[in-house]
Each structure stands twice: as structure tokens, then as C-alpha cells.
């Protein structure tokens, strides 16, 4: 389980990228992250904004998921501004070693490269430090902004997963796009 940035083989380091820091998620980030999840732009694509008690530092429904809080890098001594969350789960079978990634960011920072910087920073870590061969992500097929961000980082479409995920309102299903990234694709 994840406790203040620690998992079974943690703790995990803070990761620095251009203009951002990925900080191991802590309970102190919960309020701000729930605010971001509740925005209509994020809510459209993510599960309900009500998360289990202890989330994002500890989520008993996803004990193998590692979460990083995305923060704007304020420079020396200043408090970082929380603007989103990026998470991964690992498949540690040697023949299929890969990780799946999910991300959401505050709509106020959309279009500023924060998502791309966060994805590249986490991808670098997962390839170089965690030894993964492939990364995967599965946005809703209609989420053009997310797909554009992931494509800019180097993710390639693998295929359409029909009726992949239940709609937020619980009525019906929508398609997902499976995308993957190999180390040589990272842009």
C-alpha cells in the first residue's frame, strides 16, 4: 500500500521536470486534487470525484498504484502549487514488463505543456529507473486533447477498445484508445 510516497518497494523520489515536480502523493494533497477532479473538464473523463478515505496516499481499491502529485516548480523555498496527479501501475512479469499510466491536470493549466512535461518526466523514470520496456495509456477515444498530448510525447495508437469504459453517468459505454510508448519513441 502507498503511505506518504512509500509502496512495498518504495519510497519513491520526487521527480523534477521542466517547470514541474512530481511529488509522491500525500494525504495533504487530497483537498486540492479532489477540487481538480470535480471540475467539469476533468470530471467528464475521470471516475467520480469521491475517492476512498486516505486517497491519494493510500487507496485500498488500487494498492499497487503509485501516485505522484503534479506541482508547478516554484523555485527555492516556495511551496509548490498542486495542479494534478499522475499515477502508474506495473506489470512485473518479465516477459511483459510494462506500466500503465493515468493523468489528470487542472483545466487552468491545460495547453501550457504541464501534462507533456509530467508524462515525459514519469516516462524517463519508468524506463531508466524501473526498467520498463513499454508504457501504456488508455484515454477515452473521444478525448482529443488527451490523445494530442500523449501523441506529442511519443505514444502511438495501438487500437480501439470498443465499449471499453462505462460512462460517468452509469448509462452506456464509451470506446477507449489503447496507446503505447517504447523508449525510442519518447519525444
Name what the model sees in each region.
Residues 1-57, 184-187:
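A short, well-structured alpha-helix characteristic of acyl/acetyltransferase catalytic modules
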Residues 25, 136-139, 156-172:
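Conserved catalytic-core motifs of GNAT/GCN5-like acyltransferases
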Residues 44-110, 116, 125, 182-186:
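Acetyl-CoA-dependent GNAT
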Residues 105, 140-141:
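Short amphipathic helical patch at the helix-1/turn junction of helix-turn-helix
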Residues 116, 128, 141-159:
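Conserved active-site alpha-helix within GNAT-family acetyltransferase domains
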Residues 128-138:
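Conserved GNAT acetyl-CoA-binding A-motif
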